[in-house]
Design a protein with these regions (language model features):
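Membrane-embedded catalytic scaffold of the fatty acid hydroxylase/desaturase
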Residues: 41-50, 68-226
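Membrane-interface helix-loop junction between the first two transmembrane segments
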Residues: 15-34
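A membrane-cytosol interface segment of integral membrane proteins
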Residues: 223-254
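Membrane-interfacial loop-to-helix junctions in multi-pass inner-membrane proteins
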Residues: 29-34, 64-72, 76
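Structural signature of hydrophobic alpha-helical transmembrane segments
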Residues: 1-15
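Membrane-interface helix termini and inter-helical loops of multi-pass transporters
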Residues: 56-66
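Membrane-water interface of alpha-helical transmembrane segments
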Residues: 3, 29-32, 147
Length: 254
C-alpha cells in the first residue's frame, strides 16, 4: 500500500509540474526522472526491510505513549520523526563525510517529484534508519493502532514528493500564505537545492519548516534559484550506485 501511495503522489506532482511548471522546458519523462525512479525501486526493498526490522526489534521506549488516543499517537509520532529528520538532514550538510554521500541527492540539476529518490545508498540508510531508531528508543508504542506508524511515514513520503515538485504555486494566494506558516513547499525547498553553496545549507525540514525558523536555518529569497545542482567540478553521472563517490573525495558543503 505504501508503494502504491508513494507512486500515486509522484505521478500527481509530476503531472502538475509538467502542466504548471515552476521552471519550464523539461519533458514529463526525461532521463533524470527515469534514473530517479530506477534508483528508488532499487532502494524500496531496503526501505521495507528497515521499517519492519527496526520497529519490530527495538525495545520499548523511555516515554510511555501506548495510552494516547489515536489522534495523539499520529501527532506525537509525526512531530518526533520530522524533528529527527531535520537534525539528520542538518548533519548531512555539516559533516563532510556525510556530505560526500548526500551530494548525490543535490546533483540533480532540475527538480521534479522524483528527486527525493535520487539518493546514495549510504545516505538513504542513515536518513531512514536514524529517525526510526530514535523514535523507538524514546517512545513506548505498545498499544498503538497498527495504522499509526504507516500513516506518519506516508505523510513524510507525500511531502517529500511535493517539496521537490516543479510546480508553480501562487505565492500571494491566501491559502498558500497560511500553508507557508508551518509547512514545506516547492517554493521553500527550492533554495535548499540551489547551486549557490552559500544559500544551500538551510531549509532542512521535511514536512514542517518551523524547525528551520526555530533553529535559524531558514533561507528565503524573492526569486527562484538561477540554477540547481552541485558546483564542485565533479559532475555526478546517472550511476544508480554512485560508485565514483567512493573513489573521489568530494568538496565539503557550502
Amino acid at each position: 500500500m505504501s508503494a502504491v501511495l508513494q507512486g500515486a503522489w509522484m505521478v500527481l506532482f509530476l503531472v502538475l509540474g509538467w502542466r504548471y511548471p515552476r521552471v519550464p522546458g523539461a519533458p514529463l519523462l526525461n532521463r533524470d526522472v527515469l534514473f530517479n525512479l530506477a534508483n528508488g525501486a532499487a532502494l524500496f526493498g531496503l526501505r521495507v526491510t528497515l521499517i519492519v526490522g527496526i520497529t519490530a526489534r527495538l525495545p520499548g521506549g523511555l516515554v510511555p505513549a501506548g495510552a494516547l488516543p489515536p489522534w495523539a499517537q499520529v501527532l506525537v509520532g509525526f512531530l518526533l520523526l520530522d524533528f529527527a529528520r531535520y537534525w539528520v538532514h542538518y548533519a548531512d550538510h555539516r559533516v563532510p563525510w556525510l556530505w560526500i554521500f548526500h551530494r548525490v541527492h543535490h546533483s540533480a540539476e532540475r527538480m521534479d517529484a522524483t528527486t527525493g529518490l535520487r539518493m546514495h545508498v549510504v545516505d538513504f540508510l542513515q536518513l531512514s534508519a536514524i529517525p526510526l531508531v530514535l523514535f523507538g528508543l524514546l517512545l513506548d508504542t505498545s498499544g498503538w493502532a497498527p495504522w499509526v506508524i504507516p500513516t506518519v511515514l506516508g505523510v513524510g513520503v507525500a511531502m517529500d514528493a511535493f517539496q521537490h515538485a516543479n510546480v508553480q504555486l501562487p505565492a500571494g494566494a491566501w491559502w498558500f500564505r497560511i500553508w507557508n506558516l508551518a509547512l514545506n513547499s516547492p517554493n521553500f525547498h527550492a533554495w535548499h537545492h540551489t547551486s549557490d553553496g552559500h544559500l544551500r545549507d538551510g531549509n532542512y525540514g521535511n514536512t514542517l519548516i518551523i524547525w528551520d525558523r526555530l533553529f535559524r536555518t531558514e533561507v528565503t529569497q524573492a526569486e527562484p534559484p538561477a540554477a540547481y545542482g552541485v558546483t564542485t567540478g565533479e559532475a555526478l553521472r546517472n550511476d544508480p550506485l554512485s560508485w565514483q563517490l567512493l573513489r573521489k573525495r568530494a568538496a565539503p558543503p557550502g
